[in-house]
Amino acid sequence: MLYFDNAATTLQKPEEVAQAVKESFSYIGNAGRGANEASLFTSRLIFQTRKQIAELFHMEDGEQSSAAERVVFTMNATESLNIVLKGLLHPGDHVITTGMEHNSVLRPLS
C-alpha cells in the first residue's frame, strides 16, 4: 500500500496541483457512468493515471489482468488500511504492532 496523500501536513502545494484542481472544474464527468464525452474523458484520465503508477512501480501484467487494472484508488489511508487488514487477516492471525500506530491501524486489529 502506498500513501500518496500528504495534504494534511503540507502547506504549500505544487503549481501542478492548483492547475489540476482548476481543470477538474472544466471536465465534470463520472467515470464509468455513461458514454457521454465527459464520462469517457474522465474514464480515460483515470486509466492513464493507473498505467503511469503501474509503470512507476514496474508492475507486471498478471495472467488475468493488466498491471494498470490492479492499481486501486481509495478515498483515504484509513479506507486503504481497512481493506488490507480486513481482507488479508483472519481470526487467530498474529499481528505485531506498537502503541505508536495510528488509530486506523489499531481499531481494525482489536
Regions found by a protein language model. Name each.
Residues M1-S110:
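Pyridoxal 5′-phosphate
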